[in-house]
Amino acid sequence: MSCLRKPSQSLVLSESVDPTTVDPFVDVRAEEVVPTGCMTLWEYRDSCGDVPGPLSHGDLRRLRTPDGVCKCQIHFEFPTVLKSGSTGTVPEHPAVVAAFMGRPRRCSLEQRTKELDFRFLQLVHEGLPVRPSYMIARPPRPVRGLCSSRDGSLAQFGQGYCYLSAIVDSARWRVARTTGWCVRVADYLRLLQWVGRRSFGSFQIEESTVEHVYHVIVDTEHQSEQDGALFYQAVSDLAARDPLARIGNQLNPLAAEFCPRSARRVEPVTPQVTRRKGLARMPGRSPTVVSVGNVGMAITSIQDALVATELRNVNFGRRDTEAECRRLWARYEVNDYFRRHKAELLKFDARLRSHMAKKPVSVRTRSSDAKIQCIGWRDRHLLPQRLAGLTKQKRSLIWSRFATSNIRRKASACTMTPSVDPMVHTWGDSAALAAKKISEARRRQEICAAAYAERAKARGQTNVVASISEAIETTLRRNGTRFALDGLHVAASVIVTTRLRSWNQEEVLAGREFRKSTTSWIWRHMPSSIQDALNLTSVRDKLDPGRAFGYVQAAVAQGMSDFRRAKRSLAIVAKPVIRNVRDPYDHGFVKRDGKLRHSRDVSNKKLRTKAVAATKVHKIIF
């Protein structure tokens, strides 16, 4: 798209000077490359000595220009009198930007587009439609073919083009090219008849600081079918009052329809009628709204759809299952969840296990995403084993399944703290630094807890403690006066209910995801004094699964009777758990398949008969 021409005279030196001394490449540059494109009307009229500014439609039709001069009025520079930097809006249309900056550019429109522009101008200037466009919901037939398929949102035009808000969006580009900024009233009345919109919102015509220049403010909130007719009436009244009036000072930057594209907002257009749907859709209907992350984004054109898709892809490579779950299912704080539905979860877990056992290895060991869970990765031993290895995404599938079945299919609303971003990694601290950080945090924690307890006691709360040792002392003191099942278990639960409550509260406020679960806190806690250490040791002895019972959480969370019931439903035999040396969190599972087969649940038996038959192997005695 570039034509070659002879180099301009300024570049070639006269023969008298020796060319080699001046420029060794003179002969190389025999042809000079110039970008094609017409001279703009702005430049042409400037060179003729006229005052450059958009012409009326009649003048533009009568104007004779030499070849190579385009007739687009969009290239005219906006006069300084009307420019208002503070309230002005930044256009996007390259020609408008160039004109606004006062830099003339070449016009690179195709010939065909120019011809169509001219036909449009002819049509609008010479005749009137049978029924005006602002009465019916779309431009009348003769103009319809001249409306581009490309929607011009108002964000693309800057100051001087506010009159476009009452014009059908598919005709805006053509109108802007044939009319330029600040349309004359007479021309505007014709434009409204040919390509005016029927409903665009309530409007207001204001005088600007420059005389004979008016500004249209449109409020898109309340749209009605009569907007177009009322507006036409108002403009014709204005024409009668002030025949020299021109409309189009600036777009109001606060108007709902205008927002620079960087803000990724979309103009709420009332859609035009298409052939498919015979009549205009409801006037108040908003555009399609698509969710991008947790933000809804309005979509009115293909361009917006592309933008939305791009934004989606930035946020999540794949469609984000967790976002779906967040929308569809109730979600519980994890510990509570397991405490409530342990038996059912484990049954489902076993069912999953048996399904997986029948699948080939490649399916059984799926490659996983970053493993960050609601229960910290470090605390995964608190989850049932099957779930301990799953990613949060896969786990949420299992949870959501039970959230529905257990709550009579009603998913209630609940708050979700989004998880830490798995893609962000930081350098691990050195051991010394880590220890230092931990001790520092612990010191702060203890001060915090003590302060909390102190405040609470001052308020008159009785069951608040500042440390484990104090918790155990108060518990033992209380148990002296009333029946207690087992002092230390109760002590542990006191620790849970009091100390942890404040911490969890803090973590929730800080927007963190993990709550400290009971037992993990007991195991991780570093004693602050000898007495504390002794107390802590005895608590740990009671809780140690190797010595006492199979399921730790149940023991701490409920009384012993509940625990026995839980133990029976889980059918975990009270033997010490054998730890696997390689992975400290992987417990060898006791009586894995026998567990469900011999349970007292009849329905279970019915379900399992086939599976049992499949797994029984009889010894063949030779």
UniProtKB/Swiss-Prot annotation:
The active site is at C162, H215. It comes from the Viruses. Residues 1-248 form the Peptidase C7 domain. Its EC number is 3.4.22.-. GO terms for molecular function: cysteine-type endopeptidase activity. GO terms for biological process: proteolysis; symbiont-mediated suppression of host innate immune response. Keywords: Host-virus interaction, Hydrolase, Inhibition of host innate immune response by virus, Protease, Suppressor of RNA silencing, Thiol protease, Viral immunoevasion. PROSITE patterns: HAV_P29_PRO. The record marks G248, N249 as: Cleavage. It is an enzyme of class 3 (hydrolase). P40 protein is involved in reduction of conidiation of the host. Not necessary for replication. Also involved in reduction of orange pigmentation of the host. Hypoviruses induce hypovirulence in their fungal host Cryphonectria parasitica. The consequence is attenuation of the related fungal disease, chestnut blight, that causes cankers that enlarge and kill branches and trunks. The virus-like genetic elements consist of cytoplasmically replicating double-stranded RNA. CHV-1 strain Euro7 is a mild hypovirulent strain. This is Polyprotein p69. It comes from Cryphonectria hypovirus 1 (strain Euro7) (CHV-1/Euro7).
